[in-house]
Amino acid sequence: MVVDDSAVVRQVLVGVLNDAPGIDVIATAADPLLAIEKMRQHWPDVIVLDVEMPRMDGITFLRKIMSERPTPVVICSTLTEKGARVTMDALAAGAVAVVTKPRLGLKQFLTDSADELVATVRSAARANVKRLAARVTAAPLEAEVKHTADIILPAQSGRALAQTTERIVAIGTSTGGTQALEEVLTALPRVCPGIVIVQHMPEKFTAAFAARLNGLCQIAVKEAANNDRVMPGRALIAPGGKHLLLRRSGAQYFVEVLEGPPVNRHRPSVDVLFRSAARAAGSNALGIIMTGMGDDGAAGLLEMRQAGARTVAQDEHTSIVFGMPKEAIKRGGADRILPLGAMAREIVTQLQ
């Protein structure tokens, strides 16, 4: 079901989704109250939802859905500061993913973002609904060519390990990751290793996400800027639309934020971060791959393990989408498989 107050946007979204094999839009609605009437007749598997609508706002509607019958919800939001803030509230309320809303001149959306919408809806349809409900009560395909991390950080022969004792943590996640990261980071004490994070998310949304977490956590959380130092008690989140690399200067770590083609169809890419962590930190790193669709991060986690790092994959039971962790486990990249609730404790042990 598509719920949006713009008839033009509804028409475009429905056209894109109905053209995709295996997807059938059973209904549309101009506001949540109309949506509720239609859902009583036929409940959808996935809802694509605008968050700013008349009569009932999208957040209230989302909370109603999650309390009555948890259902995967994809937020379709505008690329504005206000839209980003509201979208963060929606993700906290149980939405599984966010896509950017098409603008009125819809050619660019049809060219650049249709595949992302379809992939996100398919990913949402596979979401662990029971886990979604438990959370509430308690990324983008950008290119046809699938690049590897080699295009950003070419593979090396031999191993160049870090000569430093400072510990760092690298985390990669996608669908369901905003809720997972909130659960992990809010459980951390002020004294913990420096953390670098890739969460698949459109540009302009990561700053609002980082600001929200910063207000909830004991540690500091910010959107990464080029040359930011990785410090104990602080987490840096890759900005949407940019790659994030870990670098080292002497005994200190810092990050590089750079442009470049999508890797595994994502920018930022988890593989890029993990490969850079393997090179910069070696055995002083902990790599964690969590809920998400696809295989981004699977190759990079294996590289981290081969460089001597401890590596962890989230288990299937607590993952919203058991795609990225499953692929990492399959390739031998994870030396441990842990539930989400054990991740914070695992991070703290990096200090020991």
Swiss-Prot record:
4-aspartylphosphate: residues bearing it: D50
Protein name stated in the entry: Protein-glutamate methylesterase/protein-glutamine glutaminase 2
Described function: Involved in chemotaxis. Part of a chemotaxis signal transduction system that modulates chemotaxis in response to various stimuli. Catalyzes the demethylation of specific methylglutamate residues introduced into the chemoreceptors (methyl-accepting chemotaxis proteins or MCP) by CheR. Also mediates the irreversible deamidation of specific glutamine residues to glutamic acid.
E.C. designation(s): 3.1.1.61, 3.5.1.44
Cysteines engaged in disulfide bonds, as pairs: none
Domain CheB-type methylesterase: 162-352
Family stated for the protein in its record: Belongs to the CheB family.
Top class in the EC scheme: hydrolase
PROSITE patterns per UniProt: CHEB, RESPONSE_REGULATORY
InterPro entries with a match to the protein in the record: CheB-like (IPR008248), CheB_C (IPR035909), CheY-like_superfamily (IPR011006), Sig_transdc_resp-reg_Me-estase (IPR000673), Sig_transdc_resp-reg_receiver (IPR001789)
GO cellular component: cytoplasm
PTM characteristics: Phosphorylated by CheA. Phosphorylation of the N-terminal regulatory domain activates the methylesterase activity.
Entry's Gene Ontology BP terms: chemotaxis
Active site residues of this protein: S174, H200, D296
Keyword annotations of the record: Chemotaxis, Cytoplasm, Hydrolase, Phosphoprotein
Reaction catalyzed: [protein]-L-glutamate 5-O-methyl ester + H2O = L-glutamyl-[protein] + methanol + H(+); L-glutaminyl-[protein] + H2O = L-glutamyl-[protein] + NH4(+)
TM annotation in the entry: none
The Response regulatory domain, residue ranges: 1-116
Compartment annotation: Cytoplasm
Notes on the domains: Contains a C-terminal catalytic domain, and an N-terminal region which modulates catalytic activity.
